[in-house]
């Protein structure tokens, strides 16, 4: 499929609706992307015609459902170029995946006197689990600072690492600033010091191709709902040798090999030992459909279109008086801003009256808000279905708000 904006927009039913009497301009895909018909129908079809509990079922529906679920594991491995399908764990989302790593790998590897590093631009999901881990183990949490332009102070990374540093947890793309970090270089620097690297890819995989083998990351995570897929499903990638050595985090059905009241329990092999209970099979199948949809359009095509649209919005926003934009000029997916002295919630409410959906608040990045000295920001985010006309409406709306509020 070539990149046809008209065709893409027709694939997303919600884009035809109106909000407050205006055509919807959905500029909040970084929070959660809209879903194409192919994804909606894939999940609906499974529940209409193919639903059954997976694993251990001898009947046809169960066997078929299991095969379809495991096919998506293989599909996910292909999507990020993992070496093996067994390096893919189905999780509820990026947040659960990071917590899984912190509670399984982290609890077994970190001890008092050890340390791990996060950056000042992380989403709370890549801060709080590590704070909790450090509180449990007595390890130290270190922070790699950022520059005023929203880039990392990478020159300070070597001095933060020592022989007791076990992990660097870093976002691929900032969910607030749109900063795309030089992940391959960061990973290489960390590995030279013997430090493993976890990458939060929640804001990256929908914008361009990710190759985990080329990056050489130890862990990589993303959520389905930001990739035009359903909520409640995500992917944790971990290198095979790391995953096989990790103990289970949650206990229950499907993650065991044997259970005995007298002899104890033995675990299933990875990745299944990390998938206790009945999985979100419908969501998994729909995530596979989302990957198929994105790949049919082509991530290179999507990246080229979105890069052009980002340049357009940054250029057009220069016409808005008293607009403060945060982050670097070169960015991916998101634009965070404030309008004069007005609170982000007020600006976002006015934009909603004009049919324009943006995100307002601290964006689960309170340390970043503190760094910039603001309680909140507005954030507009771009997806492959957004248009220059929607950008024009955003700009006109902000100019109108400035005139109304002063």
Swiss-Prot record:
GO terms for biological process: cysteine metabolic process. The modification N6-(pyridoxal phosphate)lysine is found at residue 226. It holds the Pfam family Aminotran_5. It catalyses: (sulfur carrier)-H + L-cysteine = (sulfur carrier)-SH + L-alanine; L-selenocysteine + AH2 = hydrogenselenide + L-alanine + A + H(+). Keywords: Cytoplasm, Lyase, Pyridoxal phosphate, Transferase. Cysteine desulfurases mobilize the sulfur from L-cysteine to yield L-alanine, an essential step in sulfur metabolism for biosynthesis of a variety of sulfur-containing biomolecules. Component of the suf operon, which is activated and required under specific conditions such as oxidative stress and iron limitation. Acts as a potent selenocysteine lyase in vitro, that mobilizes selenium from L-selenocysteine. Selenocysteine lyase activity is however unsure in vivo. Its EC number is 2.8.1.7, 4.4.1.16. InterPro entries: Aminotrans_V_dom, Aminotrans_V_PyrdxlP_BS, Cys_dSase_SufS, Cysteine_dSase, PyrdxlP-dep_Trfase, PyrdxlP-dep_Trfase_major, PyrdxlP-dep_Trfase_small. Homodimer. Interacts with SufE and the SufBCD complex composed of SufB, SufC and SufD. The interaction with SufE is required to mediate the direct transfer of the sulfur atom from the S-sulfanylcysteine. Its cofactor is pyridoxal 5'-phosphate. Belongs to the class-V pyridoxal-phosphate-dependent aminotransferase family. Csd subfamily. Pathway: Cofactor biosynthesis; iron-sulfur cluster biosynthesis. GO terms for cellular component: cytoplasm. The keyword Transport does not apply. Gene3D superfamilies: Aspartate Aminotransferase, domain 1, Type I PLP-dependent aspartate aminotransferase-like (Major domain). NCBIfam families: PRK09295.1, sufS. GO terms for molecular function: cysteine desulfurase activity; pyridoxal phosphate binding; selenocysteine lyase activity. It is found in: Cytoplasm. The active site is at residue 364. This is Cysteine desulfurase.
């Amino acid at each position: 499929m070539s990149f046809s904006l008209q065709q893409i927009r027709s694939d997303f039913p919600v884009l035809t609706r109106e909000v407050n009497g205006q055509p919807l301009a959905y500029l909040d895909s970084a929070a959660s992307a809209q879903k194409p018909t192919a994804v909606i129908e894939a999940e609906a079809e499974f529940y209409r015609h193919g639903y059954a509990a997976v694993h251990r079922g001898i009947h046809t529906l169960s066997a078929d459902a299991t095969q379809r679920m495991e096919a998506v594991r293989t599909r996910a491995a292909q999507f990020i170029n993992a070496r093996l399908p067994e390096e893919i764990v189905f999780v509820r989302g990026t947040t659960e995946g990071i917590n899984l790593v912190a509670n399984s790998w982290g609890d077994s590897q970190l001890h008092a006197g050890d340390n791990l590093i996060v950056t000042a631009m992380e989403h709370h999901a890549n801060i709080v689990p590590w704070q909790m881990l450090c509180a449990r183990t007595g390890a130290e949490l270190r922070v790699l600072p950022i520059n005023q332009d929203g880039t990392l102070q990478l020159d300070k990374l070597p001095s933060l690492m020592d022989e007791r540093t076990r992990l660097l947890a870093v976002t691929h793309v900032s969910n607030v600033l749109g900063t795309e970090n030089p992940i391959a270089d960061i990973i290489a620097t960390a590995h030279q010091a013997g430090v493993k690297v976890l990458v939060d890819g929640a804001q990256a995989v929908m914008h361009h191709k990710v190759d985990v083998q080329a990056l050489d990351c130890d862990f990589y995570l993303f959520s389905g709902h930001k990739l035009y897929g359903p909520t409640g499903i995500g992917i944790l990638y971990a290198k095979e040798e790391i995953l096989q050595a990790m103990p289970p985090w949650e206990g229950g059905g499907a993650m065991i090999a044997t259970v005995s009241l007298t002899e104890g329990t033995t675990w299933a092999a990875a990745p299944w030992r990390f998938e206790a209970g009945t999985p979100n099979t419908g969501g998994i199948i729909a995530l596979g459909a989302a990957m198929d949809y994105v790949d049919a359009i082509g991530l290179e095509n999507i990246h080229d279109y979105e890069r052009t649209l980002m340049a357009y919005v940054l250029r057009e926003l220069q016409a808005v008086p008293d607009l403060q934009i945060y982050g670097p000029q070169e960015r991916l997916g998101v634009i965070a801003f404030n309008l004069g002295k007005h609170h982000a919630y007020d600006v976002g409410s006015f934009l909603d009256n004009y049919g324009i959906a943006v995100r307002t608040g601290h964006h689960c990045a309170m340390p970043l808000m503190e760094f910039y000295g603001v309680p909140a920001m507005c954030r507009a985010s771009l997806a492959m279905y957004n248009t220059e006309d929607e950008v024009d409406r955003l700009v006109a709306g902000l100019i109108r708000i400035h005139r109304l509020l002063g």
